[in-house]
């Protein structure tokens, strides 16, 4: 497959863009990134004219695929023609907030921002302002954007910034614990409970191999935060309006967080973020409270139109039935391939998310786990399935970067840029896309 134009564009980009990209993960593919020219349905076409089945889907925002339905396209065009920006409130942002609050029971008030990172930055500031405390608890391997408060690694006793440029003092207020380790987080609350403003957690470790929670873990976090007067913040930037449909992952896991952060799908493919939660907490934001939060582009009318029309289309059509069914078919098909050719590997995912983690131990998945690991304690390979971010990190291999992903690319299948990011099914994907992808995995494995 000829990718000479992508190579030339990457060479040019290295002269004017840092590392040749505008987001670090885009530089991960070997030996250079694929430059995409356009998309249609569940496919993208690169700068050389090569067509790929696209399971990246913009890293998650494109629930409907690359061909937006006519009502969504019309709403975007109509808002853009009205004018690019006003710096005033608009009706469309009210309508979008009403839709979210109507479908996500934990959300009473909402504040739109411009990215998932901005949402989590604001949520952490909100929690500190509301509680008058400084410390937050995060999960090892969890991802909450490029922000100082969460770019922290280590454990409760030994921690520090995970990036240059962050003062070590930030890490003193952030306590990382292993996902799914109830004893570890309980011990942290026993030691620091009066100083903890919030626990910030993804319902699923969606940026680190799609790690499912073990039974009772989220209930433990809910109880600990409630008992110690801390806030439970769910980061649904990835899972929101994908896992659990319009009710989001919190409806699927039956947990009511105090605050939720959103992004990706609620913008319909345009830059977006949001913070939603209980009225008494959310009203700590200015202008009703003392926690400052503002943004020139927040509630941008084009983004609001794209996001609202996307969610309305999903509500009125068979979008979730379609993407979840194809997601299930993918996971079951990949589980069969893995059982035959690489039984130590683990198929993970839920609803319209999927991934194969290159774990090194364990028998082939069977029973309930053929639809993706569910942390079933009765499963014979329960001990081998990833339960923490570290487990997924231990499964990282050069084979994925240098052999497996390039081979899938040559077969016309575009996977996530690294072996940790999730892959996503869209409304634009077809049964044929699923069949072709399963066969590409079979050939590569």
From Swiss-Prot:
It is an enzyme of class 5 (isomerase). SUPFAM superfamilies: PLP-dependent transferases. Its main location: cytoplasm. Keywords: Cytoplasm, Isomerase, Porphyrin biosynthesis, Pyridoxal phosphate. It is found in: Cytoplasm. The keyword NADP does not apply. One of its GO terms (molecular function) is glutamate-1-semialdehyde 2,1-aminomutase activity. Pfam families: Aminotran_3 (PF00202). CDD domains: OAT_like. The modification N6-(pyridoxal phosphate)lysine is found at residue 264. Its EC number is 5.4.3.8. Its cofactor is pyridoxal 5'-phosphate. Pathway: Porphyrin-containing compound metabolism; protoporphyrin-IX biosynthesis; 5-aminolevulinate from L-glutamyl-tRNA(Glu): step 2/2. It catalyses: (S)-4-amino-5-oxopentanoate = 5-aminolevulinate. Belongs to the class-III pyridoxal-phosphate-dependent aminotransferase family. HemL subfamily. This is Glutamate-1-semialdehyde 2,1-aminomutase. It comes from Halobacterium salinarum (strain ATCC 700922 / JCM 11081 / NRC-1).
């Amino acid at each position: 497959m000829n990718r000479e134009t992508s190579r030339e564009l990457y060479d040019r980009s290295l002269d004017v863009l840092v590392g040749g990209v505008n987001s670090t993960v885009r530089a991960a593919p070997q030996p250079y990134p694929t430059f995409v020219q356009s998309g249609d349905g569940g496919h993208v076409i690169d700068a050389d004219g090569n067509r790929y089945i696209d399971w990246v889907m913009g890293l998650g925002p494109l629930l409907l695929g690359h061909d937006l339905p006519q009502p969504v396209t019309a709403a975007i065009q109509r808002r853009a023609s009205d004018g690019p920006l006003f710096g005033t409130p608009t009706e469309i942002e009210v309508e979008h907030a009403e839709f979210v609050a109507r479908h996500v029971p934990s959300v009473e008030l909402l504040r739109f921002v411009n990215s998932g990172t901005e949402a989590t930055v604001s949520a952490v500031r909100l929690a500190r302002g509301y509680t008058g405390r400084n410390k937050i608890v995060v999960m090892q391997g969890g991802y909450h954007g490029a922000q100082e408060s969460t770019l922290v690694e280590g454990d409760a006793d030994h921690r520090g910034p995970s990036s240059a440029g962050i003062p070590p003092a930030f890490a003193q207020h952030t306590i990382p614990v292993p996902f799914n380790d109830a004893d570890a987080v309980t011990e942290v609350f026993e030691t620091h409970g009066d100083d903890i403003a919030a626990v910030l957690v993804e319902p699923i470790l969606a940026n680190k191999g799609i790690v499912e929670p073990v039974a009772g873990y989220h209930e433990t976090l809910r109880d600990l935060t409630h008992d110690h007067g801390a806030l439970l913040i769910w980061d649904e930037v990835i899972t929101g309006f994908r896992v659990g449909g319009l009710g989001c992952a919190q409806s699927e896991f039956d947990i009511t967080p105090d605050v939720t952060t959103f992004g990706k799908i609620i913008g319909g493919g345009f830059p977006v973020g949001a913070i939603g939660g209980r009225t008494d907490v959310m009203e700590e934001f200015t202008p009703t409270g003392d926690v400052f939060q503002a943004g020139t582009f927040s509630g941008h009318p084009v983004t609001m139109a794209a996001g609202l029309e996307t969610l309305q289309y999903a509500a009125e059509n068979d979008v979730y039935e379609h993407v979840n069914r194809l997601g299930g078919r993918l996971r079951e098909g990949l589980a069969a391939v893995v059982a035959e050719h690489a039984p130590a590997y683990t198929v993970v995912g839920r609803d319209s998310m999927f991934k194969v983690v290159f774990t090194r131990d364990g028998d082939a998945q069977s029973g309930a786990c053929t639809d993706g690991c569910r942390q079933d304690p009765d499963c014979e390979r329960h001990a081998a399935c990833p339960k923490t971010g570290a487990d997924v990190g231990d499964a990282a291999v050069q084979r994925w970067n240098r052999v497996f992903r390039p081979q899938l690319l040559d077969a016309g299948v575009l996977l996530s840029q690294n072996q940790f990011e999730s892959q996503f099914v869209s409304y634009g994907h077809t049964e044929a896309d699923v069949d072709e992808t399963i066969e590409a995995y079979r050939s590569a494995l």
